Amino acid sequence: MKKLLLIILSLIFTLSLIAKDRPRDLGIEIGVFKTGKYNAITDIKGVKVGHVTLIEGNDIRTGVTAILPYDGNMFQMKVPAAIHIGNGFGKLAGYSQVKELGNIETPIILTNTLSVPTACNALITYTLDQKENENVRSVNSLVGETNDGWLNDIRGRHVTEADVLKAIKKAKGGKVEEGNVGAGTGTICFGYKGGIGTASRVLPKTLGGYTIGVLVQTNFGGKLEINGVQVAEEIGDYYYREKILNEADGSCMIIVMTDAPLDARNLERLAKRAMLGLAKTGGIASNGSGDYVIAVSTAEENRIPYDSETRLYTPSVLRNDAMSPLFMATIEATEEAIVNSLFAAETMTGRDEHKVDAMPVDRVMDLMKKYNKLK
């Protein structure tokens, strides 16, 4: 009996470890390019990520995620950027100025749908309080969202400006927390618990040696596919989010960063490829989904000064014919980031006792073995 108990406990412990491992650690290798050290958006030098997670009582299941392209005054030294809209049923704040000028001037904030105005105000406060910004009278806050209203009391608008500022302050490089954290706390993906996911790719030196990093906030539906395996079909689960959320549609926010010297035009081309990565996981960009890709170049030589003594801006940018490897790296990193979010997320119960189960990792691993998809 004692021996049997030890076996059971050992099995439970092993399954727990499997659930916490990232897909790549378990032998699921997506794509052909190598990852960075952390397989995260923070593999790009200077990029930082911070989370504030709000889990309180029975119905608060939300949070904030902040992504900083570099550690400095972004209003005074802006970075090239572009935004691609896969499906525009969303409330992304700051889009039109980025589209018009091709740069961003604040950190990127992700949160829930009804907390976008709060996050915008927090970014204004953050910017106005920075040294050298004493005369600033216009700030283009960049805030993305997904609707976490099935698990979270979204109408309560529990995210505060202090939470947003805390997420920015907590932002750091290195390993990035995934799953039920920050803006991914209350999200749902393919009918399972979604969340934050991240991944990276490093091009070989012969192709420039540049790094692509992706971070996602997954809250969308479709027919789940992992590394070419039709998981939903095999499990017999064609779970669309609408079956759970009825009229409360969600989104997928995708943040792409690279140290490659790109202008806004080629960043938009890069952003479009991220949607191909989403499609490879079985995402369908449904009518009610807000699927946005924000692409940013962190190349220091191409930062854009707010105030300059010259009228000329002379960036150094890659040629068009050097873009294809970056396109492929973006697709791979986006696909893996989404899968990472599913592996990291855990079962959650929230508002009105609504429960969303984690993806059945053990069954997924069995399928990977069945189709020889493990390295």
Describe each region flagged by the PLM.
Residues 1-20:
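Bacterial Sec-dependent N-terminal signal peptides
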Residues 20-375:
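Alpha/propeptide regions of enzymes that mature by internal proteolysis
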